[in-house]
Structures are given as C-alpha cells and as structure tokens.
Amino acid sequence: MHPHDLDARDEAFISDVIPLMDVLYDDYFRCETELEAEVPAGPVLFVANHNGMTGTPDMFCHMTAFWRRYSPRRIGYGLMHDVPFSVPAAGAWLNAAGALAANPENGRLALERGAAVLVFPGGDVDACKPFRDRYRVGRRGFVRLALREQVPIMPVVSAGAHESLFLFTDGKGIAQRLGLDRRFRSNVAPIGFAFPYGLVLGVPFPHLPPPVKIHTRILAPMRFGLPPSAADDPGIVEQVYTSVVEAMRTAMNEIRQAGRHGLVPASDRAAVVRRARSWLGGLLPVRDRGASPRDDWDERGIA
C-alpha cells in the first residue's frame, strides 16, 4: 500500500463508488450537511472533529458531500492514521479514494497541488473520546500547516457518529503503560461497547455502526492575513487556534441544540412516538369509550 503516494488517488474509482456512498449518505446515515459558504478555488484546509472510533462514519459523509458538490474532478485528500493502510482490502480502497497518512509533509504536498485537504487534528484521541465528551472539539498542529502554506481554514463540525457506540474511556493511560504509542502510534486503548463485538477492550477495531443520523456543518472560510513566519510564533498559533476552536464550539452547540442527529434524533421523537402509538393502537383491543376516565389520553397526552 502507498499511504504517502498522492498519485494513488483514482478519479474513476471515486466516480464508481459514489452510488454506494449515496445510499449510505441518504438512506443509512440520513446525513444532513450545511454549507455556510462555497469552498474557494485552490488549496483549502478542512478541519474536522473526529467521531466514531476507527469506523469514523462521519468521514465518509464528509467525503460524499464534497464529491457531490464539486465532483471527483476536484482534487481532494484526507489525512488519516497510517495503520488502516496495512489492511489489504482497505488499503487499496483508501489509496484510490485519496487518503494519505496523517503527517505535516503529506498535508504540505497535497496543498501545494492545489487540493482540498481534510484533517482530523484530534486524531485517535478525539475519535475514541468517551461518550460524555462526544461534543468536544480539540488539538492544534493544523494551524501551523495553514499558516505556512497560506491557505484558508474551513472548520467542519459533526454530531451523531459518536452515538454509534458507547465508550467509557479512551484508555490513554493504558496505552502509555503498554507502549502502544511507541509500537503502533496509538495513543488510546478504548473501553466500551460497540456492534458487533459487544465489549471493546483496548483495541479500536472498526465497528459496524447502527443507522445514526449525522448532522454536519461546514463553516465559512477563515483567513488570517498573517505571513508564513507566523507559524513559528507560539503566541500567534495559539490565537488562531482559539479563534478556530471557538467558531467550532459555537457551531457544535447549535447543532447539538437542534437535535437533528443520533439514532432517534430529538427533533423526530414526537413523530416516532405518534407512529408507535398508532401501530400499538391497531394491535390493542378497542376499549369501551365509557370504561375509563383516561380514554381520552390521545388528546391529553401520555402522563
């Protein structure tokens, strides 16, 4: 496999798999993607929060939304952990789809080609965060890359994919004690539940996610008007990082409050309850209208 080969991206392959991705996007994950502004021509750095352990279903939704809007002719790459490239079937698919091993050099080379580049700065730590932290946005290195290459940043926030499993802990302490960071570049050893394995004990194998609805917002491009040398100033890097993360947190809070994500989105629950009541009503025997003072519960609601 070629996790560092930019020429392995195959436009024809991407065109061939789009129909399958459309089914996952529309029918399985019921993806909803909001675009605040068009993606500018030329190189751009998409910076996204990471969800769903190594299965990362939201990543596929981001890719499909981009291909639909701009077609596979527009060059795009995604930076990811290099371990999946060693999986025989997955490695070839990832290469052809435009995946590259996540490191600053690959990001630089892709941007120099004028590509749109998707990065998940939180890496495996963000992807394996505990369920309670599923709306959290974290980490930094993308700022220096954007400043050095003089490209705009388009933040991407997504909710729903991390509800496809339940992790109690990311197991960072366990990973350090076992030396997983040195052996496999893995900073986590998550513990929780995921289908089809049931209990997840330290090894973040890709899981089979249930059909959770994924709600994504791609924010407008952020430009900072700073020279490349600003990438070497820790104070400036921190300021840029803070502005990006605050924009992402604001958008994430809005998406969270909208409630249009998850296995049964909050915005859909009333309709689901109505359908369930209708279905159950057809199965239950008809009651005498005078039999109970609570026979008008449909009008008054369930206590």
Predicted segment positions?
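Non-catalytic C-terminal accessory region of glycerolipid acyltransferases
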Residues: 1-17, 109-303
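Membrane-anchoring hydrophobic helices of lipid-metabolizing enzymes
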Residues: 1-106, 171, 254-303
